[in-house]
Every structure is written in C-alpha cells, then in structure tokens.
A protein has these predicted regions:
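Mid-domain Rossmann-like dinucleotide-binding core that forms the NAD(H)/NADP(H) cofactor-binding site
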Residues: 103-190
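A glycine-/small-residue-rich N-terminal strand-loop-strand element
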Residues: 36-64
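Short, basic/aromatic beta-hairpin or loop at an interaction surface
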Residues: 21-39
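N-terminal basic, amphipathic alpha-helical segments
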Residues: 17, 25-29, 57, 61
Length: 195
C-alpha cells in the first residue's frame, strides 16, 4: 500500500503517470496509478498473444489496459506503445505465466507484493558491487526491515564480494525479524532516543 501511495504522490515527479496517461481535462493532467499485478488477456488482435493468457507486470489500476505487444518471446513481451518507448523497459515488460513453475501460480499475491521491491534490492546491491562499493568498508541500510532493504542486505551478503561491515537500521519492533534473516551485523538496542 505504501508503494502505491508513493506512486500517487510522486506521479509527476518520477514519471509514473507516463505509463498510463489520461487525456487532460481543463488543463489538468491525470494518470492511472500503476501497480505490479496479474492480468488476463480478454481480447487480442496481436499474433502470438492469445485470449486467456495470464500475464504479470506493471499494470494500471483499471478494468482494462490496451497494449501494443512487441519484442515477443515465449515467456514475455514488451508493451511498445509509442508513449512508453522512452520509459525504462523494466516497467514495460510482461511475463507470460503459462510456462512458469506451478508454485508461482499459488503465490500470485506474494509475487505482486514482494518481487518488485526485492528486485530493487538486487539492483541496488549490484550497483554498489559494479562500482566496487566506492571503497567503502561499511554499508548502512536504512529501514533494513523493508522489502527493498532486506532484499539488498540478502544480495550484498550472498551474491556480491562485499567484505566490509553490513549494518541495518530498523525499529525495535522489527529487530527480531532483521536478526532472524542473518544478513546484517548484530543489531543494537538503540542508537538514539526516539523523542
């Protein structure tokens, strides 16, 4: 919910309204709020996209979405609508769910909630690794109990060659959860008073 709210509030600044724009009324521009979700193809005029297919991707919170599929692959396609071409392809790609592991079908809600933010954690960790951590001996992750935060910690801990100290910040209520993940250095009770 907080991620959806962020998109609503920052739609103009970050460009989220550009994915599913709406004609302006009286000089006021509008947009449909995008979310990561699942959709069923109910009509298709595109060879290779069949009615009844289920897809996963960055969708509009609306009853229907019109796309221009391109870059077709067995497991995916990209929405090639003209207004989306300058936008990051990560948000324009759609996975076809038909050939995916059966487990994915049972975890659709979790996939929509967790995958995008966990992937963001991977991208952040990979960015640090690609830049050799700018020589840092310590990485501090704010809100390490968030989906992006613990994803980043997990990837820094297991997928990169970071040999420094990994420190995560969290609230007292999330301390046990963060410690159970085992990706950060031991946490402390408090680093500053909360008042």
């Amino acid at each position: 919910a907080s991620d959806v709210y962020k998109r609503q509030v920052s739609g103009d600044m970050i460009g989220y309204w550009k994915y599913y724009p709406v004609e302006s009324e009286n000089g006021v521009n509008w947009g449909k709020v995008p979310v990561w979700g699942m959709a069923d193809i109910v009509e298709s005029k595109c060879n290779g996209v069949e009615v009844g297919e289920r897809i996963y991707g960055f969708l509009s919170m609306s009853s229907e979405v019109i796309m221009r599929p391109g870059k077709m692959k067995a497991a995916s396609f990209v929405d090639m609508a003209e207004h989306r071409k300058p936008l990051p392809e990560l948000y324009n790609g759609y996975s076809r769910t038909e050939g995916e592991p059966a487990l994915y079908k049972t975890l659709e809600n979790e996939r929509c909630l967790l995958f995008p933010l966990f992937i963001t954690g991977y991208v952040l960790a990979d960015f640090l690794a690609d830049n050799d951590y700018w020589g840092a001996e310590q990485v501090l992750i704010g809100s390490v109990s968030s989906k992006t935060g613990f994803g980043m910690a997990a990837f820094l801990n297991s997928e990169t060659n970071f040999s420094g100290k990994l420190v995560g910040l969290t609230s007292p209520g999330n301390k046990a959860f963060v410690e159970s993940l085992g990706d950060c250095q031991p946490t402390h009770k408090k680093i500053a008073p909360s008042n």
